[in-house]
Amino acid sequence: MKFSELWLREWVNPAIDSDALANQITMAGLEVDGVEPVAGSFHGVVVGEVVECAQHPNADKLRVTKVNVGGDRLLDIVCGAPNCRQGLRVAVATIGAVLPGDFKIKAAKLRGEPSEGMLCSFSELGISDDHSGIIELPADAPIGTDIREYLKLDDNTIEISVTPNRADCLGIIGVARDVAVLNQLPLVEPEIVPVGATIDDTLPITVEAPEACPRYLGRVVKGINVKAPTPLWMKEKLRRCGIRSIDAVVDVTNYVLLELGQPMHAFDKDRIEGGIVVRMAKEGETLVLLDGTEAKLNADTLVIADHNKALAMGGIFGGEHSGVNDETQNVLLECAFFSPLSITGRARRHGLHTDASHRYERGVDPALQHKAMERATRLLIDICGGEAGPVIDITNEATLPKRATITLRRSKLDCLIGHHIADEQVTDILRRLGCEVTEGKDEWQAVAPSWRFDMEIEEDLVEEVARVYGYNNIPDEPVQASLIMGTHREADLSLKRVKTLLNDKGYQEVITYSFVDPKVQQMIHPGVEALLLPSPISVEMSAMRLSLWTGLLATVVYNQNRQQNRVRIFESGLRFVPDTQAPLGIRQDLMLAGVICGNRYEEHWNLAKETVDFYDLKGDLESVLDLTGKLNEVEFRAEANPALHPGQSAAIYLKGERIGFVGVVHPELERKLDLNGRTLVFELEWNKLADRVVPQAREISRFPANRRDIAVVVAENVPAADILSECKKVGVNQVVGVNLFDVYRGKGVAEGYKSLAISLILQDTSRTLEEEEIAATVAKCVEALKERFQASLRD
């Protein structure tokens, strides 16, 4: 937000210079982005009056003028501005004046005519970029007065970054309140005298959406002169806040917006049919906006309508049909409180970001509307004339925000600040902030002011007290803590060790938001209810994630859209699963998840371009599981997951308990998410793996190992892992290694069957195994496979 320093000082004028004021505002939590003078450096420019204005005898586009600057005689000045005319009060740079850029004014002849000065435009004085003509001053501007003094150009524009919680500071009044509190000065508000109704004209107002619009004020003003010029003082204040003057009606509503932080809108009353209806838009309803674009509205968009059509997007943008134009004589002033949730996201949906939506999304003071209406009415009538009707107020008290009542405990205050502030000082700070304070024993009851939506809990009051007290006034205290060496179990597996392993395998760690798009999440976890946020950043970030896959897959799409087709990423973080048995109804599990897609290897002339498959990811996952020392207890079972390919996925079990999933993303989900090519994912519950098996020292056999290979034919649906597990189980004392080295389907193997080639490594720690013992153990394995899986040795 930009504002004029002098405008701020009209409300509160501390005895500090501009730099100190800017620093004070920053330390109060409103970061100052810049302080710039409102005009260039110049001197010798005064108010003058064009007494005579005649055509230059030797130039069609020049005029010869005589100008009164309050001296002994009139000055001859040649001017080329198209708006130069007799009787106009202007800014005159006299001989000896120095303009911005060190431009010195000297006596000269222009096309043969003497010129003893220059009539200046705004751009020539470094005030603005407007060079369309010379400055037109009011007819009562005192001749001979220094223009810097008359226009109050010894001023600065201060630009601040207002955080979303401080919507009250999106108006001069909010910044002034903070400066007044910090300097213990009274706030000098402009006198707003209510405008009595002089006519009975009204329009019927109906609010059909009280949750979205708890308060709506409307007032008819008839007989205005919309072509009346906006006073220079108002134009200058608007300009110094970065707003261009449009016309008197729009300028008045913008002025109230900047001064009080209350958005307003003016309708052409004669274009309203029947009356005002505040309602939600009809699905597919259209509205031509003030900028000429057509907006197609959704059913969740608030509109201001008449009895036949939508007139404006509530709290966002006005409509072209009902807008004020050069023919307007009667207006309806609107001043409303719209719920932030009813405005949030709607403007962005249509590519809009207006001053009104910016304020309504963050919250406007619900007690401000009557004051703003009276202020706007008075300014409008003073500038444009006209007569005002009564104010029509439609308020639904049940849906208006309630002021929070907060208890601040002395113990909490001292604990969080780390410094004792006297009771009377705490009370004074809270009252100066606008709170209604009741003192108790070692505590305060404070009712937050209506303009502070961010005061809700005890910590908010602690922050306010510390902020106003001054962070610089809180003494530095050394941290006092005992140095006690923590214990570390050898069985604890550090997540950092796992991350290092994945990094070594070419994965990159990412961190994604815990807030995800509920629509995308439903594609990945259909039918699973997620925790929805009451005040989301946006609609696309309104649900808490049920797994890390939602964010990871979005990251893959983001990279693929930027020509990064080989992606290997992982993430560790919490998922949030609704669970009635968990505290607060939400179970938070620490998860480890990863995604791979694209080529198996980086591009290289000596490496084939092979796409990653299920076994690439399964191999990486087994490396992770091997760090736990429990790989031999892990099973990969065929189990359906709606997000994964039914034939290329598996559930991961540890000691009979499911700990995760691995597999290829389901083709249908791949299509919906716009994934480019085969994408594989895994996810593990980390807490079920963090306790590793500590390796035990064991004797290494000094005797030779023996390898025997067998090929068994089993049904297609028999998992190879079960075959290997059975062999280990049968040969527990002598079989030290079992490996699957070939799978065959085809000639010699019946359809629906497969041949598994297995190597058995046999060894004893105390002696060399005899051939008869080896053969007996192999035979036991074969027999066990026949009995359990109906396996047969392949010929």
From Swiss-Prot:
Specify which residues bind Mg(2+) according to the UniProt entry for this protein: 454, 460, 463-464
- Give the tRNA-binding domain ranges: 39-148
Which PROSITE patterns did the record assign? B5 (PS51483), FDX_ACB (PS51447), TRBD (PS50886)
Q: Please tell me whether the keyword Secreted is annotated for this protein.
A: no
**Source species, domain of life:** Bacteria
**B5 domain span:** 401-476
The GO terms describing molecular function are:
ATP binding; magnesium ion binding; phenylalanine-tRNA ligase activity; tRNA binding
> What Pfam families does UniProt report for this protein, alphabetically?
B3_4, B5, FDX-ACB, tRNA_bind, tRNA_synthFbeta
CDD domains from the UniProt entry: PheRS_beta_core, tRNA_bind_bactPheRS
Q: Which cofactor does it need?
A: Mg(2+)
Q: Could you confirm whether the keyword Aminoacyl-tRNA synthetase appears in this record?
A: yes
Q: Which Gene3D superfamilies match?
A: 3.30.56.10, Bira Bifunctional Protein, Domain 2 (3.30.930.10), Ferrodoxin-fold anticodon-binding domain (3.30.70.380), Nucleic acid-binding proteins (2.40.50.140), Phenylalanyl-trna Synthetase, Chain B, domain 3 (3.50.40.10)
Annotated Gene Ontology cellular components are:
phenylalanine-tRNA ligase complex
Cofactor binding remark? Binds 2 magnesium ions per tetramer.
What coarse category fits the chief subcellular location reported for this protein? cytoplasm
Q: Which UniProt keywords apply?
A: Aminoacyl-tRNA synthetase, ATP-binding, Cytoplasm, Ligase, Magnesium, Metal-binding, Nucleotide-binding, Protein biosynthesis, RNA-binding, tRNA-binding
The entry's localization annotation reads: Cytoplasm
Enzyme Commission designation: 6.1.1.20
Residue ranges annotated as coiled coil are none
One Gene Ontology biological process: phenylalanyl-tRNA aminoacylation
Which intervals hold domain FDX-ACB?
701-794
**Catalyses which reaction?**
tRNA(Phe) + L-phenylalanine + ATP = L-phenylalanyl-tRNA(Phe) + AMP + diphosphate + H(+)
Q: What does the subunit comment say?
A: Tetramer of two alpha and two beta subunits.
Q: Which family does it belong to?
A: Belongs to the phenylalanyl-tRNA synthetase beta subunit family. Type 1 subfamily.
Q: What is this protein called?
A: Phenylalanine--tRNA ligase beta subunit
